[in-house]
């Protein structure tokens, strides 16, 4: 059976900072509607990989394709419609403390959909309901837990109905209960709304709980791409060291 054409594809991507290579000949294909986790040690280029897709960082070589179109060469103005189709939830929730959650979520609706105040707020409340935060719409970020702020940030990202959502370590710093709630939301986005989710994570319960496939970055490239079950069963010593957390082995972490 022929595998469908990739929705998102990195082709032999190269990226360096200050002359230090981070990604070298990195290739990865992601299918529409799947939950793809990108894992690896600190400094291996996981967050760089997702930022390259929307042009927050530019590649040095190779190609990046999205929905049948090459996007790595797009000018800044041409990236605007791309970024409406691809949302990103940053590690920090980046909410405005002076605004209620509803006002925060309404911002992209006013800017990009030109909704008037009441209409934007009504839609914002609907988006907050999608992440189980409807009753907190009139509260301020400082009044909420980290997990609740993270869910509000996801609601804001969903406001423009993106086809893809990039998550940069969405459960970092959260307690286990809040982390699993975020996992459930990510899974619901894919299964209920058909969103393609690309998740950078170090969190084993997330990785093995909700991923369709997992890509392990190592030495600038993709060492393995597999389902969680196949990753656990891998005989590759690099894969086994990462998933078991052993300090000794072929993997090295910069600074240790």
What does each of the following model-derived ranges do?
Residues 140-144, 148:
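Conserved ABC ATPase signature
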Residues 159-163:
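A short, proline-enriched helix->beta-strand linker immediately N-terminal to the Walker B motif
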Residues 69-70, 117-136:
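Conserved ABC ATPase "signature" region
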Residues 165-168:
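Catalytic Walker B motif of ABC-type/P-loop ATPase nucleotide-binding domains
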Residues 54:
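Helix-to-loop junction immediately C-terminal to a conserved catalytic motif
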């Amino acid at each position: 059976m022929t595998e469908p054409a990739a929705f998102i594809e990195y082709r032999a991507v190269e990226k360096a900072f200050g002359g230090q290579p981070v990604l070298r000949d990195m290739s990865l294909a992601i299918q529409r509607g799947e939950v793809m986790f990108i894992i690896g040690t600190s400094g291996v280029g996981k967050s760089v990989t997702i930022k390259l897709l929307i042009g927050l960082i530019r590649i040095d070589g190779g190609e990046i394709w999205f929905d049948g179109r090459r996007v790595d060469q797009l000018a800044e103005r041409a990236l605007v419609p791309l970024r409406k189709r691809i949302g990103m939830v940053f590690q920090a929730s980046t909410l405005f403390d002076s605004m209620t959650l509803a006002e925060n979520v309404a911002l992209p609706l006013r800017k990009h959909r030109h909704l008037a105040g009441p209409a934007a707020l009504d839609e914002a409340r609907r988006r907050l309901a999608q992440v189980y935060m409807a009753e907190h719409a009139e509260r301020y970020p400082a009044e909420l837990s980290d997990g609740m702020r993270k869910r509000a940030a996801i609601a804001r990202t969903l406001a423009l109905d993106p086809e893809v959502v990039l998550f940069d370590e969405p459960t970092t710093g959260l307690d286990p209960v809040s982390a699993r709630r975020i996992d459930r939301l990510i899974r619901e986005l894919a299964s209920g709304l058909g969103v393609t989710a690309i998740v950078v994570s170090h969190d084993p319960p997330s990785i093995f709980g909700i991923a369709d496939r997992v890509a392990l970055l190592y030495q600038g490239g993709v060492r393995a791409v597999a389902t969680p079950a196949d990753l656990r069963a891998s005989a590759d010593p690099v894969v086994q060291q990462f998933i078991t957390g052993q300090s000794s082995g072929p993997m090295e972490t910069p600074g240790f």
